[in-house]
Design a protein with these regions (language model features):
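Periplasmic N-terminal accessory/gating domains of Gram-negative outer-membrane beta-barrel systems
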Residues: 1-92, 102-108
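Transmembrane beta-strands of outer-membrane beta-barrel pores
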Residues: 88-90, 107-109, 121-125, 146-150, ...
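C-terminal beta-signal and adjacent terminal beta-strands/loops
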Residues: 444, 546-570, 586-590, 597-666
Length: 666
């Protein structure tokens, strides 16, 4: 599926953020408010991969969850995006390490004739971008953004105040008609403070401040893409380096004294990647073949107070080096009358982490997709494949207090997913399409937490870190469903997409090895309508309505949580995993509205927009939580048996959020 620039630019409630726009497509669920986690076809947020002009980007969000992919705000500036190819199945063999989706961003080239610029005062940031020529054969794109999200969050009464800065560039040089080189970069600096000075603080905000750490992140990716065009052959060489520095600090009661320190976490992820690829165009057949070589370095310095049945301090340091390699090939056949298309791909990956992972044959990944035009504008489509994903570095590099790579000893393996899908597509016009598709995904060797016997697949949609714990590759799961979509694209001023998904997502945990239980993404059903319409005199209106089915949740273990030693270690409640996802929330709906007006002048344009998120003031009711009052109900008991008095707190989210934005094009 292809997402155009206008769908990103004018999307209601999207705040010009590609992750929010993708949530309009079938099979894509949304999670908690103020986050951009991609949950595709019942898979977790850690199962997605992102590419920018062929260069892999480890994450596309500010304040991202390390080990997953979500965060509250996107990094990529939409001003430079030409289109996005979104794959929710049948992933290209050249795009490995994905189980749920691949987002392949295609950037514009700079204008070779003249320079232009854009300034944006948006709902959460101020931005400046420019593009143009750098000589006869070179063009450039550059942008810088700075947020004032902390003011918005303070205005609506949130207990955390994030600030971010990001920059992006692309330089393309055309040596001659046979050779070109593109150099691109993307970087972000994130800083989150706790809003501890709030007046008349609600109990819900007290609860969040009790456990939420201070987060600081730095990320960047630099890449170069060389292409050689030789008749029917295109050769590509892609090199890149990425880095992430993630720091979390938490003090008990947010009082910064050494004895109150409960979490001090610093982790770094460095990647160096090289990929070589050849594309051959033959009569009726296109063949792509290539290979990749990568080196990753993961470091971690962790001090964390935990509680199992007694207080425990986790204290370890990691410096893990990992060499990865892979091979892939794809053949695409299209019949002479364009009635039948087939794509057959094969991929294999390996690394030197352990004997379970160092053999390419063990991660052999075939995939096949077919399309047949049954009658005029009716197409039958099908796909099947086996896909592998490497567990996150946080899991690979986890150590116990004995300085042992415990997950290496536990036989950690690649996660495997066998997938199949079939559907029908009706294209009555070039701008109109209807689709119906059923899918099935089966998971094997998913990491399962040793501590709580829950698959990592049901984690990762919150701030913090995913996977930094002892696991075994013993969890299995499945996701299946039916997707319906109607799409009208950019005809007579109208663009819209309407989608409905019936989906089930289930896993077996360590307590119920013979029974499937709902995963955290088992919403049962999803409905989304999103559209924009261009009116006379440069007016545009847009709306987005989404309905999310009843998400499952795990009740809290109040008996354990009330223990003073347990609460002081975590500053939060503990789940009762013996009742894993046994309860469900109410369904949730939200309506967003947007209006744009553009004024054209002789040498510049002015666009003003009004965006209203949650126009119906819908309330998303979350499970009740508890906060400590500070009183110990049994002070005479031994320290290990003393309990806090806990107070119940109602939780809900759903603020009507209007915002005005201004864009100036020069």
């Amino acid at each position: 599926r292809v997402i155009g620039f206008k769908e990103i630019e004018k999307s209601a409630g999207g705040n010009r953020d590609i992750s929010r726009v993708v949530q309009s497509f079938p099979g894509v669920a949304s999670t908690a408010a103020y986050r951009n986690d991609l949950v595709v076809r019942g898979g977790g947020p850690s199962e997605n991969r992102f590419f920018l002009d062929g260069v892999e980007i480890p994450n596309i969000n500010h304040f991202s969850t390390q080990g997953a992919s979500g965060g509250p705000v996107g990094i990529i500036n939409p001003d430079f995006v030409r289109e996005v190819n979104f794959y929710s199945a049948a992933f290209p063999a050249a795009r490995g390490n994905a189980l749920s989706s691949v987002l392949d961003f295609k950037l514009q080239d700079g204008n070779p004739e003249k320079s232009s610029a854009r300034a944006v005062l948006g709902a959460s940031e101020i931005a400046f971008s420019a593009n143009g020529p750098l000589g006869k054969k070179t063009t450039y794109l550059v942008s810088v953004r700075r947020s004032y999200l902390q003011f918005l969050f303070e205005l609506i009464g949130l207990p955390f105040l994030p600030t971010f800065t990001d920059a992006q560039f692309k330089i393309k040089h055309q040596f001659d008609r046979h050779n070109e080189l593109s150099v691109l970069g993307l970087g972000a600096i994130d800083d989150m403070k706790l809003n501890t000075d709030m007046k008349d603080m609600s109990d819900e905000n007290k609860y969040i401040l009790e456990y939420l750490p201070v987060v600081k992140q730095k990320t960047y990716t630099l890449g170069a893409v060389y292409k050689h065009f030789a008749g029917h052959n295109i050769y590509s060489l892609i090199g890149s380096t990425s880095y992430m520095d993630n720091r979390n600090v938490k003090y008990k009661g947010n009082i910064e004294e050494p004895e109150n320190l409960s979490l001090k976490y610093r982790s770094g992820e460095s990647e160096f990647k090289l990929r070589s690829e050849n594309l051959f165009h033959l009569p009726f057949v296109h063949i792509t073949a290539g290979g990749n070589l990568e080196y990753a370095r993961y470091t971690n310095d962790t001090y964390q107070k935990l509680y199992t049945n007694t207080p425990v301090v986790q204290d370890y340091r990691t410096a893990l080096g990992l060499m990865k390699w892979g091979l892939y090939a794809t053949a695409v056949y299209e019949s002479y009358n364009e009635r039948f298309t087939a794509s057959l791909g094969l991929r294999a990956d390996a690394n030197d982490y352990s004997n379970e992972m160092n053999n390419l044959i063990n991660q052999l990944s075939p995939r096949l997709s077919l399309s047949y035009r049954l009658y005029k504008d009716i197409y039958l489509n099908g796909n099947a494949g086996r896909f592998y994903e490497l567990p996150p570095y946080t899991t690979l590099g986890f150590k116990n207090n004995k300085d042992e790579y415990v997950n290496q000893t536990n036989g950690l393996r690649y996660i495997r997913s066998d997938q199949a899908g079939a559907g029908v597509e009706f294209r009555p016009a070039s701008y109109l399409k209807f689709t119906a598709e059923g899918f099935y995904k089966h998971y094997n060797h998913y990491p399962m937490s040793v501590l709580d016997s829950v698959p990592l697949a049901s984690k990762g949609a919150d701030f913090g870190v995913l996977g930094n714990e002892a696991v075994t590759s013993t969890a299995s799961g499945r996701a299946y469903g039916l997707e319906l979509m109607g799409r009208w694209y950019n005809y007579k001023g109208l663009t819209f997409i309407a989608s409905y998904t019936w989906v089930r997502s289930e896993y077996k945990d360590g307590r119920n090895p013979d029974k499937y239980l709902p995963s955290a993404w088992d919403n049962k059903y999803l409905f989304t309508f999103s559209g924009t319409y261009s009116l006379p005199r440069n007016w545009d209106i847009g709306a987005k309505f989404r309905l999310v089915g009843p998400a499952p949740y795990t009740p809290y273990d109040i008996e354990k949580s009330s223990l003073v030693e347990a609460w002081d270690a975590k500053g939060n409640l503990y789940y009762d995993y013996s009742r894993f996802n046994s309860e469900r929330l109410e369904p949730f709906s939200q309506l967003d509205i947007r209006v744009d007006k553009t004024y054209s002048f002789r040498k510049w344009m002015l666009t003003i927009y009004l965006d209203i998120q949650n126009a119906m003031k819908s309330t998303y009711n979350e499970p009740d939580v508890y906060i400590k009052t500070g009183n110990i109900v049994n002070p005479e008991a031994p320290a290990s048996q003393q309990r806090y008095e806990l107070k119940a707190v109602k939780r809900s989210s759903g603020t009507l959020l209007p915002s005005i934005g201004i864009m100036i094009d020069l």
